Amino acid sequence: MNANLLSTANGSPIQSMTERPQLVWGAPTAAERGPVIATLRNPDHRNAVGSHAGGYSVYRALAIAARTLAHDHIADLTDTAPVEQIGPHPQWCDARKIVSLDPWGHLVGEVFREHLKRGYDVRPTIAVTRAHIDMPEIRAAMAARRIRADGDIVSAHGSVRVMKAAIDPVWYLPGIAERFGLDETDLRRGLHEQTGGMYPELVSRPDLKVFLPPIGGATIYCFGDSAKLGDGLTPLACRVHDECNGSDVFGSDICTCRPYLAHGIEIAIQMAQAGGVGLVVYNRKEGRALGEVTKFLVYNARKRQKGGDRPADYFARTECVAGVRDMRFQELMPDVLHWLGITRIHRFASMSDMKCDALLRQGIAIDERVPLPDDMIPPDARVEIEAKLAAGYFAGERPRGDYAGTVGRGLHE
């Protein structure tokens, strides 16, 4: 054996702890893949560009600058292990299947234990816990007898037991470039230049293939037995939802986001209570990843335009302000489902062809698409829904509405 290699407790080789660990993305084991190290305690150990915590990495830098956080703080990972087992799945060992997250990111305390003992500052990029969620829409569904209290998944007063996991982005740059049909050098240059030169290593260190971008990640919510996720046998109901703070949290009625989120949760619960499993994936992509400032500017433009807020101009107003109608890049969205070992969705709560097509391109089958029920659409969101239906969004058996005659509420109403 090479003198620079050590062995873990099970005999798997690991590198000398005086070296920068090599990363072999898609390797068959964690030991062969190696840990992702983007911490700064020892720059010689870094094998990735960027730093941990996604969009919160800048707050960490501010905390260190303000001397409220020690720059050499070492995380105590005692009792932080996942509360439920996820993986490993075959997709973890395919460098083309998962390119935007670290599939071993929730298991660093286990699979990289020897690295931690020898002073490598390896951090989790995924955390898995349990929780109860409580939403008025769930209680309304119980009152309408679409969901029942079972004492297991749903309590008598309407709270729902879930397994949830938070996932920070970890990008394997060659895989990201391939997913978008780009040259890796062009991708690196674009990321470097269009962030104002924020990450010079993107262009100066082509040997570093992994990048931890300062963007939001995703949270998954699993309803029912999470051990059944990815078993290939258990029926799965799924909603992939992109963040909309105004609607999801505050109930703004200009869009259908919260209604569809609630509907996705409802069908996930129904599937779990029928012996299957339910899943909601919540991606931090506010305003179609254009951001909330841009979204509110578009709202103003829609409401102030001559003739009022109309479906015919719904996408055009976004393009006028942002230059593009959507930057969510659903090409990366299937990765979280690959992480969970999912190969088939039996009921998919989505009207978006972009989401559906992205999953199909990645080999994830969809048996049934479930549109948002018409009675869940807020009045002012009719503009959005008519525009999307005209653009080809899936509607199921719903008849077309009054596209030409639909006008949204005025700005000052």
Regions inferred by a protein language model and the residue ranges of each:
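Catalytic domains of riboflavin
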Residues: 1-413
